[in-house]
């Protein structure tokens, strides 16, 4: 039974197809867009960190230049013993005289700003700090160390404040009761279209054994078949009676083939003795097996000292950020 497709079914099919296409396009767009957005945010964060480090480095350089200018003018200034942005301030630099210019502060001043190593005469003694090893990097800092251990979890935060009460709803309205429609008795409608075939049901119970069948009747004789293949030959017949005696008719024939060789004759008499043989020197024989190894000899004297080895690899500044130079350099 053919089921005709209605207009509503065709419209629902179009809507379902459009919904599937739109959802598939949205999933593909999200799969492509999210990694690109994440990559952009990560690159922007890296660029922002580089710019922040550059600003910190410029600020540090400005402070160092200001300190050097104050030290060059001979102004007594009491500086705090501390680290500047996590960087070491060498005491032998031009700005190190801050701890030695003022005689009444920490130590006696020096012409090169190295007064931190001399004893003061008006107040406290000079601050004794170990000089760091000389570095070749312009950033004056080493590579980043390994990450530290994970810290303990923080305390739970305080509960938030209760939210504001919601607005009052609208007042209810008294609606009239819906008008009752008159009861209409409709006639029985036409049967609907035949539904799809349902799934196969479970197997039924086993039936009782049937009655024994009756013997069938013999069929009619069939048609004659094709002739069979040729049979095998029969056994040999009995031996016949002997024939008549033959007659000898002498006729000269051809010469026959030579006969077989006769047996070996008896050995002949012993011959005369031959002359004496001559001796020749044979080739040298193969070398003999190797003997057992001898005892280990005494240890020899120590050799002279070898030449000095090559110098080790020099440090590099691969961990330093690229310099930020103004346009035109």
Curated annotation (Swiss-Prot):
One of its GO terms (molecular function) is structural constituent of cuticle. Residues 142-171, 189-212, 216-248, 253-279, 282-320 are annotated as: Triple-helical region. It comes from the Eukaryota. Keywords: Collagen, Cuticle, Disulfide bond, Repeat. One of its GO terms (cellular component) is collagen trimer. Residues 146-329 are annotated as: Disordered. Residues 156-173 have a biased composition (Basic and acidic residues). The keyword Repeat applies. The keyword Signal does not apply. Pfam families: Col_cuticle_N, Collagen. Residues 200-212, 251-272, 320-329 have a biased composition (Pro residues). Residues 187-199, 273-282 have a biased composition (Low complexity). Collagen polypeptide chains are complexed within the cuticle by disulfide bonds and other types of covalent cross-links. Belongs to the cuticular collagen family. Nematode cuticles are composed largely of collagen-like proteins. The cuticle functions both as an exoskeleton and as a barrier to protect the worm from its environment. This is Cuticle collagen 6. It comes from Caenorhabditis elegans. The gene is rol-8.
